C-alpha cells in the first residue's frame, strides 16, 4: 500500500484517485483538497504552525496561487489566516466550520469507499484507477499537442 493510502485512504481516494466532484456535497472538491492538505500538515506536525509557503511546497503550488485560494477559503469561513509576527510569516488554521464539514464529508467518503472495495474488490478498484489515470494522461498529452 502506498504511503498516501495509509493516512485517510478514503479522502486520498476521492481527492487523488477517483476525481468525482459529485461525491462532495457540503464542500467543493477544490476547496476540500486544500483543506485536506492543511489538515494533514497539522496532524503530522501538531506543535507547529502550517505556514503558507510550506503548504504551497507540499501541494506543488506557487505561494501566489495558493494565497488566492486560501483567501477564498477564508471568505467562506473555512480557514483562519494569521501572521506569525515573530517568524514574519503567514500561516493558516482550519476553522471549526471546516473541521465539522470535513468530518461529515469524510464519513460519507468512508462509506462509499468501503462499499466500492466490498463490491468491486481492492485489486479491480486499483486496476480501474490505473486505467483512469492512463486515460487522463493521454487526454492531457492530447490537450498539450493540440493547444
PLM feature spans:
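Key DNA-contact positions within bacterial/archaeal DNA-binding proteins
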Residues: 32, 64
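Charged, amphipathic alpha-helical coiled-coil/dimerization segments
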Residues: 71-126
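C-terminal regulatory/oligomerization modules of transcriptional regulators
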Residues: 1-6, 123-147
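Short, locally clustered residues in the helix-turn-helix/winged-helix DNA-binding domain
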Residues: 36-43, 106
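A short alpha-helical element within helix-turn-helix/winged-helix DNA-binding domains
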Residues: 49-58
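Short, hydrophobic-biased segments on the C-terminal half of alpha helices
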Residues: 52, 70-71
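N-terminal leader segment of winged-helix/HTH proteins
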Residues: 1-30, 36, 76
